[in-house]
């Protein structure tokens, strides 16, 4: 084979063929259509070599097997027929691998996802390493697709239909031990012996057939299968609200294969893949994927980042504890926490311990790895251990004088190059830096709660922040596993600014008599993970409403909330889930009961709670205000691009991913339709709905936020 081949064949002296996978010039292996000829040439050599005892597919990359198929291939398809052909070509190649006359083993280390797992499924057996980097899954549903190279047919027959449905419908990734338990792999070994273990398995003349567990065998029968698919359809419809067509097609295709045989299943899989590839939902989800990939590669500024070897954190509360965990346990950086008392430090340490112990309990990591990661975190009630910190993150109360004091103390106790990053959600960074000796090293770094789960951070430079400070802070965010967007130092920044009118309108409709559950259900139906009122309960009613006066002072009446209602709720000691008193009823330890609204809430705000608006009207009122504010942020350059605005909304507040983000959604509606809708709502509900100048200009010029030169492709 030539040196540019992604697949290279080597026949060992013991007559086992080793096919090494190494896509030239790429950090990860992905499958491309042009590789098919290379693979077929190798398969031909294998078939012709009658002395071969077996075949092993293994990656030559350091930490991944195959991360999936190259998604750009789908974007190049002009219609469903072309996408279907792409799937059929993949199916045929996998069938040729499966048809080899000798044992074929996939030796897996690192990510084995999508088309990579479909290739592994076409092999006769699979062995993987016990490394934390090794994960196996079929995440195509997250792109609005289904596995198109045989995955919907081979996986159910290997691991059972219920396990396969769960994996394919959710896109969940299994770690090595989970994959072994599920029957997805046949053995788990240390990386050092992966190849030899695979070779030994390949030499076996007969490979024992795995027997499915009794439960899976029952579910594979006609009666069990009918019951299972009926339940899965019901649960999936409740979860997706009909917004994700891929899930229904996945269920149909798997059921077809089990009921009518593999041939019909493969045919249904290819057709469904082609049709789904052309849906607006898949196009939007792929656009989000490419946008997030580009954001993760964006350095934030043109300057090189400064040193980043250790981090300090001020405050050991909920946010400080979460920031310490992502910095040490995801970023691998030593962390020193300062709190005014040892309780705060202990809280932060316990925060990380609990998260790590859960990983140990689930066998994601070993106890030794837990101890190693926890050892990166230390604490003190003074500034001992801070002198060499490259960046210090402040996570104290939202009090401007206190934060300014923190700046002064860090400048006094840390190195001259130390960056001060504030986790404020509402205070201007320029005000925090007002008295700084080195204002160019002060920046905002806004995390979202819970820190360990929320993928977004906002990086907020003020007018004097240096380019190097921006680059260093963005670098830290990436090390923490976050997706950073750089936003301007204006009140509310970006995410909270577009979220506030959305929540305000929900509260306003509540005061008009709409029921809590009706408002929340309408927005969940629209595509949000939770409704606005439940969201307020989750983040804390006090926390979620404290920014409203800041925004109202900065931008005027359009940000005003029904103040008497908010005050009444807070005065009744209702903070949401955290104190077990909110809009919803809570059981023990603040657990929310199953969608039960506290009926006392209506009496508290003086309404009876009788819904009059349709779900579509409720969603329209909330969402249009969010979109209008997002357009203002674009106009005022609060965000650098529509791309950043879409990523910020999807990753920061759960804007429906299948719509692609607020800017792709506005482009889909069209600026003219946006303006007309806002004008209609303004006539009904008041000037807060008046379309912003940006949208009016775009409607006049027939412009879009995403230009023709910007595509959903990854290159």
Curated annotation (Swiss-Prot):
Catalyzes the formation of a hydroxyacyl-CoA by addition of water on enoyl-CoA. Also exhibits 3-hydroxyacyl-CoA epimerase and 3-hydroxyacyl-CoA dehydrogenase activities. The gene is fadJ. In the N-terminal section; belongs to the enoyl-CoA hydratase/isomerase family. In the central section; belongs to the 3-hydroxyacyl-CoA dehydrogenase family. This is Fatty acid oxidation complex subunit alpha. The record marks 118, 140 as: Important for catalytic activity. Signal peptide: none annotated. It is found in: Cytoplasm. GO terms for molecular function: 3-hydroxybutyryl-CoA epimerase activity; enoyl-CoA hydratase activity; long-chain-3-hydroxyacyl-CoA dehydrogenase activity; NAD+ binding. The lineage of its organism: Bacteria, Pseudomonadati, Pseudomonadota, Gammaproteobacteria, Enterobacterales.
